[in-house]
């Protein structure tokens, strides 16, 4: 389990993270979402042990991450801005990773080499962005980390490779119980793989819970007629006779209210992660217009 407690970080007087708390259950695929500048990459770099907190702490299975080789040996980190040694090949990096990670799995490395059709003896710096991303996954997953930390993991990949990478992540979770933290702007892809979500804004955690609980506690209802009593309405729009409301309720609770109202038409719809994201940030002075699709 990963725990972040009261984490604060400032840069030159700017507070990037403020008293932030976060919990990633063991074996979870945790999606970290937020607008640009929310502090996602800063938070990820703290969890990866790159940044030192001004205050607060980050632990993996109870061990502090900062300046702790034992804790860092449990995690694999793939940043958005990849780094490889200047003239290093994949084979060079394999030897380097083997020296850092006692858990490095040569058999898995060879197996993944069949999926990632990359030249092993060419300098990685000559690879395209997508090829570099594939190389990073190949090497990092071969380390068999207990915690996989990913910042925009499929950026720069074509649709086929994006699907393959996501499948690789899920297979690793299923087979080895790997815990995954992934930050991405592609909320629809996150929705396909994540079971927990945290929404970050202005250096604070607005909301974190399981995706099922998040989607189950708020629904969208489209209907014709007057708005029934007994609903906590979070947002409303009318287009002609068709009304759409977002309510704080389960689907069953909303259906019970509308059944009693005996309206000529109603439909209860789940909210996507993208809609939840827009709605939750709508309460923090962000645009709400796209929540009604």
Predicted regions and their residues:
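Short loop/turn segments at beta->alpha junctions
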Residues: 89, 210, 269-272
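A broad structural signal for short, well-ordered beta-strand segments within beta-sheet-rich domains
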Residues: 19, 218, 233-234, 263-265
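Residues that scaffold the ATP/ADP-binding catalytic core of kinase and kinase-like folds
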Residues: 68, 230, 276, 280
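C-terminal coupling/interaction segments
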Residues: 246-293
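ABC transporter nucleotide-binding domain
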Residues: 164-251
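Short, flexible helix/strand-to-coil boundary loops that buttress conserved ligand/catalytic motifs
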Residues: 69, 215-218, 258, 281
């Amino acid at each position: 389990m990963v725990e972040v407690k009261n984490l604060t970080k400032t840069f030159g007087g700017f507070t990037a993270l403020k008293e932030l708390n976060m919990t990633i259950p063991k074996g979870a695929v945790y999606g970290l979402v937020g607008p640009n500048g929310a502090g996602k990459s800063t938070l990820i770099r703290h969890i990866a042990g790159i940044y030192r907190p001004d205050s607060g702490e980050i632990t993996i299975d109870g061990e502090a991450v900062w300046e702790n080789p034992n804790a860092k040996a449990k995690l694999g980190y793939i940043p958005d801005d990849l780094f490889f040694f200047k003239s290093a090949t994949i084979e060079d990096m394999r030897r380097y990773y083997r020296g850092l990670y006692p858990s490095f799995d040569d058999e898995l490395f060879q197996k993944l080499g069949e999926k990632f059709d990359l030249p092993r003896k060419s300098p990685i710096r000559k690879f395209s962005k997508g090829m570099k991303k594939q190389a990073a996954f190949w090497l990092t997953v071969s380390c068999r980390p207990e915690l996989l930390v990913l910042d925009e993991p499929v950026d720069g990949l074509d649709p086929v490779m994006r699907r393959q990478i996501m499948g690789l992540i899920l297979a690793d979770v299923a087979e080895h119980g790997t815990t995954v933290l992934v930050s991405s702007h592609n909320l629809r892809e996150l929705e396909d793989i994540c079971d927990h979500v945290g929404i970050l804004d202005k250096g604070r955690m607005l909301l974190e819970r399981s995706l099922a609980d998040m989607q189950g506690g708020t629904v969208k209802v489209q209907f014709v007629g007057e708005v029934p009593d007994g609903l906590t309405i979070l947002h409303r729009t009318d287009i002609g006779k068709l009304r759409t409301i977002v309510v704080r309720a389960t689907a069953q609770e909303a259906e019970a209210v509308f059944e009693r109202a005996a309206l000529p038409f109603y439909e209860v719809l789940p909210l996507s992660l993208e809609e939840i994201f827009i709605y939750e940030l709508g309460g923090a002075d962000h645009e709400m217009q796209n929540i009604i699709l």
